[in-house]
């Protein structure tokens, strides 16, 4: 049995302003009640090392994604990030791609590496595929991705990427069951096999729409 510890440690020492030890990654999660499949950022079993979660109080999907004015989100996110840092996390991530909006502010606010969104991978993927291919950016809701989301993670307007959302290919019922405001039940649930089929189907359609797609990044 592999244990999540290092039995070879013979000496320990405090780090300035750090309260806890042993967790490498701190994860900011939304103030929403929904489950995560194994492999989901919200499910700690996805990681082969200890993680520390922090709820960003008052910031739900409805607030972060749908609200026009996102400024009320900033201070709660900063508090969550600072708490994770002070607890001893060596890096901070966030569970939802729409946190990209605040990448620059949070990276400047704490002294550990910050990865607020999977969209950070897009510029890297663009370099990998070269200028003659495009990177597909697949979002849960394309209409809610603003220019600041892209600017904050270094995605250059007009560069070699294309973006689509679930709404471009119809409904994904298991997504609605988990996350869609006004549709999901009070205690959301979903079935993995159904979700997998729906996501793969629309991902394949997206790829087929762009024969020069060299990579795809999921928001």
At which residue positions do the language-model features occur?
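Short, acidic/small-residue loops that bind anionic groups at enzyme active sites
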Residues: 105-129
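Active-site-proximal loop->helix
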Residues: 127-133, 148-153
